[in-house]
């Protein structure tokens, strides 16, 4: 049993996980708590920042209590670091209370501001500065939305802060401070100087004094206040170190700290990334600062990942009564269906698409459906579509930066699927290593805490020492590679073939909703 531990705290969209890690990266104890989210109207998603804090307190108390059950005292905790949901923005007044509900990364209310601001400032210049193509996800456009649509809230907001900055303030007091890898997803950081972009701030009419102070990964942000120690069970004056965005922390947690591998999180959304020593920006990815403090993460993201599979099974197969046996049956049946799902091809953009098209009016498409297809065909076609989209994005990334990867490191619930693992290996032609680490983001934060505690001389060294073993390695079946290459070439043509039709249907649906709303008011 470990006698000294660090805590990696992952404050994600739906819950907080506080996990105590040993020097070898073994999870010793954990605490968890949910975070509620509201959906007040179409395309709007909000949270109360105080819920982040209460969830954090509950998770930390649970972790400390489990440590105590194992005979590990609070003073054995040597450091803490936070991984957090990215691109979620809190608005706080001069008393540190919310002046407006926090806008969550899923929110799309600022679509008009995306168009107007990018046209006025220049879409290419925004991309060059921030590393992010113009899209509704970065917080950049939410500042503009609040200023235009909620002027009183804009006036009453003293600080605009990310999740980490908010939690660090609650833990340690003092000024608002955050890690660079939490700041950069806000969309207003100059990615080459790693500082708030003065041109963007000027265009937003936003003073830098209203933003957190940026610190490098592994920097000491503060120490736990005695009152917080009493509330959580943490030792007073425990050092809290700068970690950051959950995506970058997940990459660190899988030890994707060198350029020969890509991590891929087969979760609700599918997120994949590679490390690069140099700054590159391209529509095929969004560029993030790397968690180890050197270089960048080139990241692609498919919003509708495993969500699509769960949605299909829940809505059309199990009718709200899905369990493991349903997925096992579909997996077995789908494994016997030929590549291409007997003529089915899916476009998995059920929630719009980020890279490489950056089109929020894109929608899902099932092409080739006939009466001879069953539920297992659609199940397989969904997995094929998600896989092909990721292979396409990664290959485009490799070509653009002249950097070839040798293998994937897979995490997330989808990595438990033998069908999905083999499909990714076969379609990419690269081995797929499955990480034993179930909570890669919390482990990444734990690695940064371990560096802060002085266990290792660098964050990279901590990652190499603490990353879990790859107990499953799936090799590609070369006999089917040509079939997947042919299917990928067809898939690449699908978006362009249906783009205008999708746009027309989105516009038509919006018009009908407005007509129905008007009719309801008149009635």
Feature-to-residue mapping (PLM):
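Extracytoplasmic ligand-binding clamshell segments of periplasmic binding protein
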Residues: 210, 216, 247
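Residue-level signal for inorganic ion chemistry
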Residues: 25, 48, 80, 107, ...
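Short beta-strand-loop/turn "lid" adjacent to the catalytic site in phosphate-handling enzymes
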Residues: 67-105, 133-137, 168-190, 213-216, ...
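N-terminal glycine/serine-rich phosphate-binding loop of ATP-dependent small-molecule kinases
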Residues: 1-100, 128, 156, 229-230, ...
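A structural motif corresponding to the C-terminal end of an alpha-helix
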Residues: 203-210
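Short loop/turn motifs at secondary-structure junctions
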Residues: 73-76, 210, 387, 404
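Active-site core segments that coordinate phosphate-bearing ligands/cofactors
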Residues: 7-9, 111, 118-131, 135-136, ...
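A short local loop/turn or secondary-structure capping micro-motif enriched for an aromatic residue
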Residues: 36-39, 108-110, 306-307
């Amino acid at each position: 049993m470990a006698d000294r531990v660090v805590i990696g705290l992952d404050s994600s969209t739906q819950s907080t996980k506080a996990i105590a890690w040993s020097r070898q990266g073994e999870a010793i104890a954990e605490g968890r708590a949910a975070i509620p989210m509201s959906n007040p109207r179409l395309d709007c998603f909000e949270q109360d920042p105080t819920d982040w804090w209460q969830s954090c307190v509950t998770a930390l108390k649970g972790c400390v209590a489990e440590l105590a059950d194992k005979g590990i005292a609070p003073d054995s905790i040597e450091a803490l670091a936070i991984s957090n949901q990215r691109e979620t923005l809190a608005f706080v007044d001069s008393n540190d209370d919310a002046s407006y509900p926090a806008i969550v990364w899923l929110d799309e209310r600022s679509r008009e501001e995306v168009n107007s601001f990018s046209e006025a400032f220049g879409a290419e210049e925004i991309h060059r500065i921030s590393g992010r193509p113009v899209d509704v996800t970065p917080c950049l456009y939410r500042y503009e939305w609040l200023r235009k649509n909620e002027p009183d809230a804009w006036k009453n907001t003293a600080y605009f802060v990310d999740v980490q900055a908010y939690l660090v303030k609650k833990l340690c007091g003092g000024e608002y401070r955050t890690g660079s890898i939490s700041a950069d997803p806000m969309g207003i950081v100059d990615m080459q100087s790693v500082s708030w972009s003065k041109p963007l701030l000027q265009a937003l009419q936003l003073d830098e004094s209203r933003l957190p102070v940026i610190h490098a990964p592994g920097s000491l942000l503060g120490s736990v206040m005695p009152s917080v120690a009493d509330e959580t069970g943490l030792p007073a004056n425990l050092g809290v170190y700068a970690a950051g965005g959950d995506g970058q922390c997940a990459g660190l947690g899988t030890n994707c700290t060198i350029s020969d591998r890509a991590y891929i999180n087969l979760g609700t959304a599918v997120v994949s990334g590679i490390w690069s020593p140099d700054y590159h920006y391209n529509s095929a990815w969004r560029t993030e600062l790397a968690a180890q403090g050197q270089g960048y993460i080139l990241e692609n993201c498919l919003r509708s990942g495993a969500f699509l599979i769960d949605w299909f099974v829940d809505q059309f197969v199990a009718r709200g009564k899905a369990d493991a046996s349903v997925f096992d049956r579909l997996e077995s049946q789908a494994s016997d269906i030929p590549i291409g799902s007997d003529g089915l091809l899916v476009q998995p953009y059920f929630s719009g698409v980020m890279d490489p098209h950056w089109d929020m009016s894109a929608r899902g498409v099932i092409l080739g459906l006939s009466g001879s297809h069953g539920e297992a065909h659609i199940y397989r076609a969904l997995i094929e579509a998600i896989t092909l989209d990721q292979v396409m994005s990664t290959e485009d990334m490799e070509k653009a930066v002249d950097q070839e990867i040798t293998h994937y490191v897979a995490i997330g619930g989808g990595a438990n699927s033998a069908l999905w693992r083999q499909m990714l290996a076969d379609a990419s032609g690269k081995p797929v290593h499955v990480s034993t680490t179930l909570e890669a983001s919390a482990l990444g934060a734990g690695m940064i805490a371990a560096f802060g505690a002085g266990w290792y001389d660098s964050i990279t060294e901590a990652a190499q020492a603490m990353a879990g073993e790859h107990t499953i390695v799936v090799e590609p079946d070369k006999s089917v590679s040509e079939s997947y290459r042919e299917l990928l070439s067809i898939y690449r043509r699908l978006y362009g073939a249906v783009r205008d039709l999708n746009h027309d249907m989105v516009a038509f649906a919006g018009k009908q909703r407005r007509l129905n709303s008007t009719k309801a008011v008149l009635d």
